[in-house]
Amino acid sequence: MNISAIILTYNEEIHIRRCIENLLSVAEKIFVIDCFSTDATINICKEYKQVHVIQHEWPGNQAEQFNWALNNCPVKTEWILRLDADEYLMPESLQKLKKITADLTPEVNALSFILVRYFLGKRIKHGTGTIRLVRMFRTGKARYENRLMDEHMLVQEGIIKDTDIEFADNNLNNLEWWITKHLNYAKREARILLDQEHRECSPNQELSRHSRNKRRQKNIYARIPLFWRSFFYFCYRYFLRLGLLDGKEGFLWHFLQGWWYRTIVDEKIYSFLKKQK
């Protein structure tokens, strides 16, 4: 297939083999952009002829690192597919991708995939609705917007086609790792929300329709009072969107990601505003 894949890594020995082997049947070349991993990530990558490793210092966020990859990877294929190391295409979607790509018209410059979420080994089916993300695009036709986190793909022209291709986000690390990661995320999220509270953010028209809708929802969330908004958001996800049907793992996911994490973000915002008085 006329596809190159790009994966960003740092100490991903627990995930990288699964991700690479998932892509071997659909990608001519797999570029791994590694931030000087200290585990076995690089050694695992070297086992595969289709994989080309480029090491580059972490610039501070995913968007900058991926855009650097777009500028520096010797991509010769028509299409680029992006996956994180802890992600993979669902088995039934591998064949679908081959068929969809073969039938695309010239005006289609990007494809959105459906996110399948796993938490502590269980698929989370409720609470957020269908999440679509642009994960494949014609070479030279897209870049990530410059954001600290929650970055979305900007497609410069043409059509973004919604597909039924599914990709899984299935991280194998333990809950302690997840909590530590989100404590770090909270600092960046607080900076983004503080910025949104002081100005109206109009979603970029180069974003997909789904990304624009998500950005509008975040703009609304940013205007709800601190601490109340995380509580309301959890209730919305867990009760109204039936997150309670996802069992114990589902409760932990919706509570930790929907309420706890966002409360930590609000605490950081509150502390910052308090110091400004």
Please name every model-derived segment.
Residues 2-4:
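Cell-envelope/extracellular polymer assembly enzymes that use nucleotide-activated donors
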Residues 17, 39-47, 92:
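Acidic helix N-cap motif at the loop->helix transition within catalytic regions
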Residues 6-26:
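Short, well-formed alpha-helical segments that are part of the catalytic scaffolds
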Residues 63-70, 83, 90-273:
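Catalytic-site signature of metal-activated, phosphate-bearing donor transferases
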